Curated annotation (Swiss-Prot):
Superkingdom of origin: Eukaryota
One Pfam family in the UniProt entry: Zn_clus
GO CC annotation terms, alphabetical: nucleus
Localization of this protein: Nucleus
Record protein name field: Conidial development protein fluffy
Gene source species: Neurospora crassa (strain ATCC 24698 / 74-OR23-1A / CBS 708.71 / DSM 1257 / FGSC 987)
Keywords: Conidiation, DNA-binding, Metal-binding, Nucleus, Sporulation, Transcription, Transcription regulation, Zinc
Recorded GO MF terms: DNA binding; DNA-binding transcription factor activity, RNA polymerase II-specific; zinc ion binding
Residues annotated as signal peptide: none
Broad class of the protein's primary localization: nucleus
Composition skew (Polar residues), residue ranges: 678-688
Region Disordered: start-end pairs: 662-704
Length: 792
């Protein structure tokens, strides 16, 4: 017998008459009797009903958005849209009409043929009026390539060089793997746009991006005059491009941008492809978009950044090789953008691609000074970025260093990659690096010099091939470079973010150089016969302690004046290393664990509140104000002269601290801006007597910088608050590790390995996806059989 159909809900009339209802609208009984048929809404619904309702609402939302975008972006079609709306045409029909006239899914191959063709050819420069017609048809193809490398195509993740995603802790990572944009060609025709093609990106569509008003000054070198073109198909809004360029060149890590601002901006305005290209401009704009803090609209910020970066990668993929200067610079800028997103593996691949392009690029010896400077900054900056990443991640194998790396990937040994040829090429590249340093500006040169000195020694020490004499030489090079740095720059209260970052990196280099020798120098090749005698009889443990303190102090100064909401790309790694070293000096790890668990990032966000105030105020105990620091005994005998401004002020201060930690009248003018102070000098201190320091320090000077304590527990608290206030993936993971200090503290040291750490952590180590572990804990990957060379 067939199963009888059940009606889940009868109409009101059939329910009242207690007759059978077929559930139709109107039902058969009401229709035959001519009665009004009505249903009472059910009090419960199945999941199928809810899914249908959700899908219906989503369709209505998409239709409404399509109509709104059309009204906003296409002034010439307003009358057509309004006439259809006034004609009571349904939103669904209007949305279908918009999609038909926009041809949303036109073939990407036809669209990509409009972009820059040959190598070195000048790009197609569109005026705002010319770009309007072509922009909406080109945007979706640019956005489609925002997924190359680390974004999504449909449901699959496409890594840069591997068929499967990689982990930062995998032991088979090889920097010799070439990054080939050519391999991404299969995705060029994937018709899966991330954004509607009709959407135009402009400053008006980003209302919450903190773009400064046009009346406010830009970075020197970027004038308020309208730009003649934008060099990008993503937007024709010249004002937006102007603001993003200003944002990029004013970034706190601009010394690592590898791009001379004056040469680039001149080429940008004149359409000169020698210093500028579409790929480089898109990379710069994407990096600038992603550097905005959380105060900006996260959706708009990411949409802009992904679109610009995706277009840069697409343009680089169309190049047969990257032998021109702008392409090499674009790869390096993309690497910095990936670092800021916490994507260390992608940044690693892009940085190596930049170095490989710099090596294979033909060098011209008869060039003007402007091009020599641009080439030197790009060449040395690319190598320095790799050196930094290797120091921060423990990938110090000598065979895979930039100077001795393989140029080609494959099972067969090519003549260029034979060991002897790699050694000869390594010496030649190192000599070229030293020659290019002569053309670099003073600030980048300082960073390049100390990084190369520390990286060279660390690479040989990694394979147990370094000697005590080489350690002394590397340490001496760092001190000499800092002395020249101090003589060149006035390290006063008006210091720039770049100067602060350079000093933080200098102290991290000292920490990375001497941390393996705090307990023992047994890893040195001649340690049994020779004990390293550092300049001024310096002690590695004292230097590491003072350097870690200096990193935290300088970061606090940076936070006070520039905010840590969006920090320089590598700052979280260095700060975490300093905090972890202070953990090893802390006698009570349980107390630290309690502090780390009570971290409240919002306490350190104020530009006026000092980190030390926030750290101790978080516990509601006003009696925990740190005491005055102890004078540096025999300071000049083991610490490089001169000191950084913060440490220098700490040495000079001995007067009791007043209740007010900052004197607003002496620090800020009526407009809220910092006033320069001539009472704070950068001269080297010659007196260490407390009475002399007290008499030479004024109240204004005493209140000008935060007063810090050198107690390890207090420094860990301050550093933890600083990390918690950073909007950075590595800082988030570092904060999570600091909450486990009670279990990690006894393991921190030069002999720590990943297996021991994995057993000690209270959470799976696989949850940590960046290189912050290697940075803070001083970890190094297991060395392979060393190449038999004697380094430059």
């Amino acid at each position: 017998m067939p199963r009888q159909h059940l009606t889940p809900n009868a109409c009101l009339v059939c329910r009242k008459k207690r007759t059978k209802c077929d559930g139709q609208m109107p039902c058969r009984r009401c229709r035959s009797r001519g009665e009004e048929c009505a249903y009472e809404d059910k009090k419960w619904r199945t999941k199928d009903h809810l899914r249908s309702e959700i899908e219906r609402l989503r369709n209505e939302q998409r239709q409404g958005h399509a109509v709104i975008r059309a009204l906003i972006n296409d002034e010439q079609d307003w009358e057509s849209f309004l006439s259809r709306i006034r004609g009571d045409e349904s939103p669904e029909a209007i949305a279908d009409w918009i999609r038909s006239i926009r041809n949303l899914f036109e073939p990407l191959q036809a669209a990509s043929s409009q972009s820059m063709g040959g190598l070195g050819a000048p790009p197609t420069l569109l005026s705002p009026s010319q770009a309007t017609a072509s922009e909406s048809s080109q945007l979706h193809r640019a956005a489609s390539f925002a997924g190359i490398g680390s974004y999504n195509f449909g449901q699959g993740r496409v890594p840069f060089d591997q068929s499967t995603p990689r982990s930062s802790f995998s032991s088979d990572l090889s920097p010799t793997t070439p990054f080939s944009f050519r391999e991404q060609a299969d995705f060029i025709h994937a018709p899966q746009p991330m954004y509607p093609s009709s959407r135009r990106f402009s400053s008006s569509s980003l209302p919450s991006l903190p773009l400064r008003h046009s009346s406010q000054p830009l970075v020197p070198g970027i004038f308020n005059e309208p730009l003649p073109h934008t060099w990008t198909s993503i937007t024709s809004d010249t004002q937006l491009v102007q603001r993003l360029l200003s944002r990029f060149f004013s970034a706190p890590c601009s010394l690592l941008c590898f791009i001379p601002q004056s040469s680039f901006m001149k080429a940008f305005r004149e359409g000169d492809s020698r210093y500028c290209s579409e790929a480089l401009v898109n990379a710069i704009l994407g990096k600038a978009c992603k550097s905005y803090g959380t105060a900006s609209n996260i959706v708009s910020r990411m949409a802009f950044g992904d679109a610009f970066i995706g277009e840069a990668k697409r343009l680089l993929a169309t190049e047969p090789n990257h032998t021109n200067l702008p392409s090499t610079q674009a790869l390096a800028v993309l690497a910095l953008a990936e670092i800021s997103e916490g994507k260390d593996d992608e940044a690693w691949d892009l940085a190596w691609a930049s170095v490989r392009a710099a090596i294979t690029r033909e060098q011209s010896f008869h060039v003007d000074q402007e091009f020599a400077t641009a080439r030197a900054v790009s060449y040395c900056g690319g190598f320095t970025l790799i050196h930094m990443l290797r120091l921060l991640t423990g990938r110090l194998d000598l065979n895979t260093s930039p100077f001795f790396m393989r140029l080609y990937q494959g099972s067969e040994e090519t003549p260029e990659d034979e060991p002897q040829n790699r050694i000869e090429r390594g010496f030649a590249l190192h000599m070229q690096f030293l020659a290019e340093l002569e053309h670099c500006p003073p600030l980048p040169r300082f960073v390049f010099e100390i990084t190369t000195a520390v990286h060279t020694f660390a690479s040989y020490n990694f394979s147990n091939a370094a000697t005590a004499e080489e350690l002394e030489d590397a340490y001496g090079k760092c001190l000499d470079a800092y002395k020249r740095f101090e003589e060149t720059f006035c390290l006063d209260m008006d210091t720039t973010p770049d100067l602060l970052f350079a000093q933080i990196w200098y102290h991290y280099c000292l920490l990375a150089l001497l941390r393996p020798f705090v307990k023992s120098t047994a890893s040195l090749r001649d340690s049994a016969m020779t004990t390293p005698r550092l300049r001024n009889d310096a002690n590695p443990s004292d230097i590491c302690q003072r350097s870690s303190e200096a990193i935290i102090f300088l970061t606090s100064t940076y936070q006070t004046r520039f905010s840590l909401g969006n920090p320089p790309e590598l700052l979280p790694h260095m700060l975490f290393a300093a905090v972890l070293y202070q953990v090893t000096l802390t006698p009570d790890p349980e107390h630290l664990s309690t502090i780390a668990n009570d971290i409240k990032p919002e306490l350190s966000e104020s530009p006026v509140m000092m980190p030390s105030q926030a750290a101790f105020g978080a516990h509601g105990n006003s009696n925990l104000v740190p005491p005055p620091p102890m004078p540096f005994n025999n300071h000049g005998s083991y610490f490089p002269q001169p000191l950084s401004p913060v440490l220098k002020l700490e040495v000079r201060q001995a007067a009791p601290r007043r209740e007010s930690s900052i004197s607003l009248s002496s620090t800020f003018d009526s407009c809220g801006n910092r006033r320069p102070s001539d009472s704070f000098t950068s001269s080297t201190l010659t007196s260490h007597d407390a009475s002399e320091r007290e008499s030479s320090t004024s109240d204004t000077q005493s209140d000008f910088l935060p007063f810090f304590t050198s107690e390890p527990a207090d420094l860990v608290t301050i550093g933890s608050l600083q990390l918690a206030s950073m909007q950075h993936h590595g800082a988030v993971e570092a904060t999570r590790l600091l909450r486990s200090l009670s279990t990690v503290k006894d393991l921190v040291g030069s002999t720590l390995d990943l297996e021991t750490l994995a057993e000690a952590l209270p959470f799976p180590m696989g949850d940590l996806n960046t290189a912050v572990l290697y940075t803070g804990l001083g970890l190094q990957r297991a060395p392979v059989e060393p190449m038999q060379v004697t380094g430059p």
